[in-house]
Amino acid sequence: MTARLLALLLLLAPLPAAAEIVLPTGFSTHVYVTGEGFDTDSGRGARGIPSTSTIAFDGTGALYLARTGRRYGGGEAYDLWPIYRIPPGGARVTPETERRFLHGPPLSNPQVAGTRRGKEILVTTFDRERKVGALYRMADGRAELLAGGTPPRGTPALFQQPEGAAVDAEGNVYVTDRAQNVVVRLDGDGRVVDPRYLAVTRPRLLATDDKGQVWVASDGAAEAPFQQGPGEIVRIDPTGTSSVVHRGSVVAAIGVSPGGHLFVADRHERQIFVLTQDGRRVAFASFTDNDAPRSLGFAPVTPETQRAGVAGDLFIVRIKAGTWIVNEVLRISGPFDELIRGR
């Protein structure tokens, strides 16, 4: 009995992330979500869950992930999957236990795009052949169409390939459409406010901050986000004025910390940096041993996340040792905003 209990405690204990990530003094990291049995190369047997490139939290501290699948594969390649919901505390997933973490209905090429009011998960989907995309809001596992979808006959689709989504303090919803080279602005009910809020080549990622600014990362000439680019990050201020604040390799993910700082994951340079208001880069983390960041997001600060012990922590989807087919989620804790203010 004692041996079984000890084995269970060891199984549930967080794993150290080893030396594949280099962090500033005062920060710690652990593996938060991992898995076994998903690597198709039985000889390699890499740990991790099926590849995922989008991540978001609700106000309770539950983590949502979506499979990357063959979203950029072209041709007839597409995927129909539910998203994952990981309860506070993390998880170790296997093919036998995967079902308990699946959340909501199967959707076509889903991406966890963001959250709203701490309760609703915004999910984008698209059908490559029909060139029709949709934005869903998901609550309690039920998906409800918010905008887009199949239009009336003779009417062009609002979205063709929606990717990121974000909500500002006034409740407006912003959606990137990578195929149509625009960012669309919606009201809280999904009605179109501005179909061309921003015109930019292959926009993919979105974030908003408490200053009323909208941040958009685009892929530029890269046909797929795993290509080098170059890409760029545009900041739109509350007056609607846009400015390019960063040019470089295509970034994998962006996310705003609870203190309002924009963190950027650069897969090609294998690092995470902070982008200041004037476009200055502040180094935060670097990866070794052929590891790289694939996505990132911060847990919100709420009474529930504080009780769960994850409030304000940074979570990173990691590609380990160049193995794209499976990924792990790392949790990083530390004084993020104090570090940036000190730089």
Q: What role is predicted for each listed range?
A:
Residues F38-T60, L102-E120, P152-E170, V200-Q213, ...:
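Beta-rich, blade/repeat-based domains predominating
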Residues A17-H30:
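Blade/loop signatures of beta-propeller domains
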Residues G74-G75, D79-R85, G133-Y136, N181-R185, ...:
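A short loop-to-beta-strand structural motif that recurs across blades of beta-propeller domains
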Residues I86-A91, M138-R142, L186-R191, I236-T241, ...:
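Short loop/turn segments that connect beta-strands within beta-propeller blades
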Residues T68-R70, T125-R128, R178-A179, D219-A221, ...:
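Short loop/turn segments immediately following the C-termini of beta-strands
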Residues Y64-A66, I121-T124, Y174-T176, W215-A217, ...:
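Residue position within the beta-strands of beta-propeller blades
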Residues H30-A46, R92-H103, A143-P156, R191-Y197, ...:
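A short beta-strand motif characteristic of beta-propeller blades
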